[in-house]
């Protein structure tokens, strides 16, 4: 069967079909179980981070090297021709893409990855463009859910914290809307509620969702608890303390959880997950971060049409 992801730009999670999502997730599972260190032998991948990153950049570069590829690029745009000499982003993309087989980029400007895809000679993978999209985070989230739940259909998923500005929860909701029977529980302050356009998309897909005031009231029903931080910089101190108070997870909050419940978080956390949760069987956020390597290995291998064993 032809590989539908070969040479495909990965700019938005909406660019990826359900079948393609399943292919990536199952390929990630294969690569986690059976390392294949020569999949990207003789391939050169650009890792161009115009904005600071820790987990995304390091996991991409780890994925490339574990598959036998070579990384070129930068983690700070301040010394590039773009910054020093006024070169346009389009020209930078055109030149860099002529050196490589695939192009991973993060940029603070919304829409930068889409622009890059119009000028690149090779597949562009969006490592985050402002508050817009972060599709590879969603891929590792889906892989972590699949790994712990055994499926991506008929799941009850709670999304907690900053649902207004958090690009990870937007993309995850959009991705899971492609699957059957999922139900969402939105838990957020009114000022940080899920945007209307996401709710409209869920309505279009006949996806069930409802809003709640606390984590404890939904814990007995859910399979996945996806935590995010309330961003302190968006509020004054008094308002922030009030906002975050009702959206902190502790071990005692999980006393009525189902056995299969897993707690996820895109990281970094601040204090929205108490450290006593780390030792519970429900905590999965550090394994989730590790899964970023396997999800990105799978994506790179597929867009470059590598022959995957197993």
UniProtKB/Swiss-Prot annotation:
Domain of life (superkingdom): Bacteria
EC number: 2.1.3.2
Species whose genome carries this gene: Vibrio sp. (strain 2693)
Sequence positions that bind carbamoyl phosphate: 55-56, 106, 134, 137, 267-268
Pathway given in the UniProt record: Pyrimidine metabolism; UMP biosynthesis via de novo pathway; (S)-dihydroorotate from bicarbonate: step 2/3
Protein name per Swiss-Prot or TrEMBL: Aspartate carbamoyltransferase catalytic subunit
Family membership noted in the UniProt record: Belongs to the aspartate/ornithine carbamoyltransferase superfamily. ATCase family.
Example of a GO cellular component annotation carried by this entry: cytosol
Keyword Transferase: yes
Underlying gene: pyrB
One Gene Ontology term from the biological process aspect of the record: 'de novo' UMP biosynthetic process
Catalytic reaction annotation: carbamoyl phosphate + L-aspartate = N-carbamoyl-L-aspartate + phosphate + H(+)
Keyword field: Pyrimidine biosynthesis, Transferase
Subunit organization: Heterododecamer (2C3:3R2) of six catalytic PyrB chains organized as two trimers (C3), and six regulatory PyrI chains organized as three dimers (R2).
UniProt-annotated binding residues for L-aspartate: 85, 167, 229
A Pfam entry, by short name: OTCace
